[in-house]
């Protein structure tokens, strides 16, 4: 089965062609970072309009790159949620309309299921069952994964997602949007130990996360330095970024190890934008090796939103016989554990 995948849940337009026999044939991604940078964050209406402009040219490009014609495509998969409702509607309406015109089925894909399954596109994919850490700007969740669609939520953030905390800490340090990668780069120049921030909720049983207190601690450190010494210099900003990143990564690593120990599993999958963080990957590999566990993740280009993960996830559901009517349904909020198993 050959599937055209469309991703438009937020500020990236992703298109890909995946073939169940040949694997990923082609993918393209257009990022709206420059469009939203002057506003310091994503403007939903601008995101929707830019998806309208970019989607068709990207489809043409991917179809050509994959050597596919309309007759070669067996189905279309599009992101149906969660995400920005207007952006989702662009991809859903386009995907449904194109599928109707080509006389093929279309299926709506859960955005976070796409992220969760992105490591399956690697040469050495993880095997079920495993624990997944979904960590992005909108989600921080630990999920027990028995099979595609068989998900049990083990714990999640009770306030901000880790990626959102990265972005807000970056604003405190007057870094450019998007903040997460900026914090990570700046942290590499920081001095370890100059600032110390809490590891939220690691002293409590359970697998819930909280990052609002860490944001407050970071803001307090920035303001205290301003009052005593004026605006932080470059080295001070790097030291704060280093301490902040260490606190987030330590918290995630501790909870991931705890989740594996509680479930008795030996495989962890990390997915979502924050899974591209080099320190998170390195620290997880070291910590999990101590308990004989392994960590899997997607290549960097598939950590952020992309069409390849949507094409793959949609293909698996279509191969399992999932069918949908012609009505367009998208959801700004959509619990992962509400999905049907295959």
From Swiss-Prot:
Residues the record lists as binding substrate: 134-138, 167, 180, 277
The keyword RNA-binding is annotated on this UniProt entry: no
Residues the record lists as binding Fe cation: 111, 115, 305
Gene3D superfamilies: 3.30.420.40
Keyword Transmembrane helix carried by entry: no
InterPro entries: ATPase_NBD, Gcp-like_dom, KAE1/TsaD, Peptidase_M22_CS, TsaD
Keywords, sorted A to Z: Acyltransferase, Cytoplasm, Iron, Metal-binding, Transferase, tRNA processing
Localization (cell): Cytoplasm
GO biological process per UniProt: tRNA threonylcarbamoyladenosine modification
Enzyme class: transferase
Reactions performed catalytically: L-threonylcarbamoyladenylate + adenosine(37) in tRNA = N(6)-L-threonylcarbamoyladenosine(37) in tRNA + AMP + H(+)
Main location: cytoplasm
Cofactor section: Fe(2+)
EC number of this enzyme: 2.3.1.234
GO MF annotations in UniProt: iron ion binding; N(6)-L-threonylcarbamoyladenine synthase activity
Entry similarity comment: Belongs to the KAE1 / TsaD family.
This protein's name: tRNA N6-adenosine threonylcarbamoyltransferase
Organism, as annotated: Cellvibrio japonicus (strain Ueda107) (Pseudomonas fluorescens subsp. cellulosa)
Encoding gene, per UniProt annotation: tsaD
